[in-house]
Amino acid sequence: MIKKFCKKYKLPENTLHELLSHMAEVRFSKGELIISEGERNSNFYLLKKGIWRAYYLTDGTENSLWFAAPGDTAFSSWGYVDSEVSLINIESVNESIAYCISKPELEALFSHSIDMANFGRRIFEREILSVDSPQ
């Protein structure tokens, strides 16, 4: 998970270990919602174990948007960027473990380390690429 994450986001391992030292390990059960539609959640997650899925409901039908695997990040774009309620659900597909940090704590790290600030920029660059990628 560490090597995958560092390669994907071009982050030195020592910087990732610094980030992890500020994050809390959290566990989720199969089917548990990490973020619910209509909820405000500005936390930032790094998936250690398990699979997560983001989806929204249309007329009772679940429409999947993306899946996250170990080494991937996950967060509510609306909650993180604008402190708005989420328009999607993020669910743990199976038993999962993630690292979690609040937006204010993460932004404090960004302001104290150029490696962390660059990491933050790359996260959002990856988000833009995922939105623009043809399916």
What are the functions of these language-model segments?
Residues 1-135:
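Cytosolic regulatory regions built on CNB/CRP/Popeye-like sensor folds
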